[in-house]
Regions:
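Membrane-embedded, hydrophobic transmembrane alpha-helices
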Residues: 1-126, 534-548
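Transmembrane catalytic cores of multi-pass membrane glycosyltransferases
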Residues: 29-34, 354-446, 453, 460, ...
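Hydrophobic/aromatic-rich transmembrane helices and adjacent perimembrane loops
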Residues: 43, 225-228, 339-341, 473-497, ...
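Extracytoplasmic
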Residues: 45, 533-753
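Membrane-interface helix-loop-helix junctions at transmembrane boundaries of multi-pass membrane enzymes
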Residues: 124-125, 307-317, 355-364, 435-458, ...
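Active-site lumenal/periplasmic loops and adjacent helix-entry segments of GT-C-fold
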Residues: 127-129, 141-294, 598, 604-617, ...
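Hydrophobic, aromatic-rich transmembrane alpha-helices
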Residues: 298-307, 345, 349, 423-451, ...
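Membrane-interface alpha helices of multi-pass inner-membrane proteins
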Residues: 319-335
């Protein structure tokens, strides 16, 4: 394809660095070369090539970075829609043909347009320095994510017991459910529909179907890295487009992956003092980063659209098709994406109307298209409801350290006076990574704020939604973190301007700024070194107060000294930004220091060795039993389990290891109704059915009730009883209810159907 903007030679080095880091992580984490080759081949053939081909067919030839940033999520949408269609029609065998059909059809369209001017954007020249900074920041960000994620997800082992983060077995079970059944239902509540953000699990199931790579290897090792990589690439592209500088894109990667709200406690497993951590959600929620790949692509296209003067030419319509497809992908990937886009675009339209007295037509089209697609997917994918959602403003701030401490003040009058300030401090702590935004308020730079209006509206939209509602498990924070992604670009723009201003003052100012940054790093590390994870919240807050006073003194002294000494004044915003960025940059290193320490000293990075008397995990014996079910039963098999708890006290009923590692459906597995989208206390047929199943299951395993067993086998198709002998066992009479087909020291399987 003549005229195609290929990757410039100067970009090969930065791209090679990131690729080398990804491959090295895969190899170190135990992924075989064959699995890596199959996975990479799949991603290129089934995602990148179809998406890039359709993008070029609709919009003309784009630059290589834009092609990847937009073509990848577009390819994911195509992949998911075709996979769903072939599964729904019982023709899964046709799925491998889809890339050939799409690429050939699009190639024909592109060939027919040969010689026409491309409608896509030109990337022009990019600073080599910006590309290297972006590559280095993204590489370090990948390492951070892996150090947080990989120790929690050892591959299933026949050598040692494992305890997974509570959501991960559920995710594995959902992938297996998609792979084996259509339409997919809840693997832990057999046959019951589960309205959920399924698309990332569709994708992993599709990879398993085509490549044969095991589901745990795909989910725990392979699939998350390209997603994080794509977010970094998209931040660079969107930041460069909106900020009109590659440095804005590079610094957006720095803000997103390397900055966070300061945590002094070196306790990655504990609750952070400012509660919300974007970096945590990148690995703990598989749907969140997957959804962000659609959000950032849409942000780019919407930013492009609102700058356009037309909305209904043939080129416009082709772009609307791309936006519509991405909105479909976004809505099924993460429920927070379209609401934030819609609210943010609505705020943008209001701002433009108020400031310019004009109605932005393209913004209205975005709103109309988004509302239609959101309404359709809300009904189809999510069943028209969001269980556990209530109107409760600023609910998540109550979990920040300042609010916790203020809430414990014994004097009611003093508590009421202090609490509003505690909430403000809690919000400020959450937003520390966005300190760079403040620099745009400096007089000479205020004029640039209008360039970032859309990003600021998306950022504000996420905050607005998150602070109006409350969801189970504080899931409203995903709205906030989705908005954060647009805010990263604005913060990066402020940091770029600050650095340019420092350099404009002179070499001595640049040197002083670097030394001040290093000095603050040393101060904060020193405070962290003497701060125990067991420190009470009050003591922790006092340390933050002490750092704040040192900060205020530092800013005051530097600004006054500059004025009295007749030096060029750096200004309060420039001086004040240095400690804030230093503090934000230390968040992840401090949190990961225990893991890094184990790695450097040669100790095992994975410390999840559960004691069955305290924590219930996946033991080698249980894994063997679950694999027996996977190998000796059909994919449609339903079985019942004796244990539902992840703790020996029987207070947390979210054990979902059985469906995950047998890849079979279970009569009722988790005793936590939230896992099935059921809110106990609100009378519904779903709640009645769930509680009825719990009673039947307990009757079988606790009392060997033959009547209950008859209902299980005849009405619900249960064919096996799985007795977990490590975690509680069952009534001895249960072993007489059928024929024992498998038994070891960890589990017994009784055939009853």
């Amino acid at each position: 394809m003549r005229g195609t903007p290929l990757m410039p030679r100067r970009a090969l080095g930065p791209a090679g660095l990131v690729a080398a880091v990804v491959v090295l992580i895969w190899v170190i984490s135990g992924v075989g070369a064959g699995d890596i080759a199959k996975f990479v081949g799949y991603e290129i053939a089934f995602v990148l090539l179809p998406g890039a081909s359709l993008l070029w067919a609709l919009r003309g030839r784009e630059g290589w970075l834009v092609t990847v940033a937009l073509g990848w999520p577009l390819g994911q949408t195509l992949e998911i829609l075709v996979f769903s269609a072939t599964a729904a029609t019982g023709s899964r065998g046709l799925f491998p043909v889809y890339p050939i059909v799409v690429v050939l059809a699009c190639a024909l369209r592109i060939w027919k347009r040969h010689g026409h001017d491309p409608s896509g954007s030109s990337e022009g020249q990019m600073s080599a320095g910006a590309m290297w900074v972006a590559a280095a920041a993204l590489s370090l960000g990948l390492v951070y994510v892996c150090l947080a994620f990989l120790p929690t997800v050892p591959l299933p082992s026949l050598a040692r017991p494992i305890q997974y983060y509570v959501d991960f077995p559920n995710f594995i079970g959902l992938i297996a459910e998609v792979r084996n059944h259509w339409p997919p239902t809840s693997p832990g509540l057999s046959g019951v529909p589960l309205h959920y953000q399924w698309f990332v699990f569709y994708q992993m199931a599709a990879i398993n179907q085509v490549t044969g790579v095991s589901i745990p290897v795909i989910a725990f090792r392979l699939d998350f890295l390209p997603t994080i990589l794509m977010i970094g690439c998209q931040l660079f592209v969107v930041g460069r487009f909106i900020g009109r500088s590659a440095w804005v894109g590079a610094l957006a990667i720095v803000v997103a992956f390397l900055l966070g709200p300061l945590d002094l406690t070196t306790d990655a497993a504990g609750a952070p003092p400012f509660f919300d951590l974007f970096s945590f959600h990148l690995w703990a929620s598989w749907t969140f980063p997957f959804g962000l790949t659609f959000f950032l692509a849409l942000l780019y296209l919407i930013a492009e659209r609102v700058q356009a003067t037309t909305w209904r030419t043939s080129a416009d319509i082709r772009t609307w098709v791309v936006i519509g497809l991405l909105m479909i992908g976004a809505s099924g990937s993460k429920a927070t994406i379209l609401p934030v886009l819609l609210v943010g675009t609505g705020l943008y339209a209001v701002v433009v109307f108020v400031t310019k007295r004009t109605v932005p037509a393209n913004a209205l089209v975005v709103l109309g298209l988004g509302i239609v697609i959101f309404g359709a997917t809300f009904a189809i994918v999510y069943g028209g409801g969001v269980p556990g959602t209530v109107i409760q403003p600023i609910a998540s701030y109550q979990y920040t350290a300042p609010v916790k401490v203020a809430s414990k003040i014994s004097s009611g009058l003093l508590r009421k006076a202090v609490l509003p300030f505690a909430y403000i401090v809690g919000l400020a702590g959450m937003l520390l990574p966005f300190a760079g935004m403040l620099y745009l308020l400096r007089g000479p730079h205020r004029g640039q704020l209008s360039r970032y209006t859309l990003c600021l509206c998306m950022f504000g939209g996420g905050l607005l939604i998150a602070n109006l509602i409350h969801q189970v498990g504080s899931s409203e924070l995903y709205f906030q973190d989705t908005g954060y992604t647009a805010g990263f670009i604005v913060a990066a723009a402020g940091l770029r301007l600050a650095w340019m201003d420092v350099r404009s003052i002179g070499a001595s100012a640049t040197k002083a700024g670097v030394l001040a940054f290093v000095g603050w790093v040393v101060v904060i590390l020193a405070v962290s070194a003497v701060t125990s994870p067991a420190l009470a919240q009050g003591g922790l807050v006092l340390r933050y107060v002490a750092i704040t006073f040192i900060y205020l003194a530092f800013v005051t002294v530097v600004v006054r000294y500059s004025r009295t000494a007749g030096l060029p004044s750096p200004g309060v915003l420039m001086v004040g930004l240095i400690p804030l960025v230093a503090a934000a940059a230390l968040t992840t290193p401090i949190q990961l220091s225990p893991v890094i320490g184990r790695f450097l000293t040669g100790q095992p990075m994975t410390v999840t060795q559960p004691d069955p008397q305290k924590v219930r995990g996946l033991t080698p014996g249980l894994l063997v039993a679950l694999q027996w079910l996977q190998d000796h039963t059909s994919a449609d098999t339903v079985f019942a389990v004796s244990n539902h708890w992840i703790d020996a006290a029987g207070t947390d009923g979210r054990n979902q290891n059985y469906s995950a590692f047998s890849e079979r459906q279970i009569f009722v597995e988790s005793y936590n109704p939230d896992d099935y989208g059921i809110t106990v206390g609100i009378p519904t047929l779903a709640e009645v059915n769930f509680l009825y199943r719990v009673r039947l299951n307990d009757a079988v395993f606790d009392h060997a009730d033959t009547g209950a067993l008859t209902i299980l086998t005849r009405q619900y198709g249960v064919r096996f009883l799985f007795i977990d002998r490590v975690h509680g066992g069952a009534n001895p009479a249960v072993f007489q209810l059928g024929s024992i087909v498998f038994s070891n020291n960890a589990a017994t399987i009784v055939a009853v159907g």
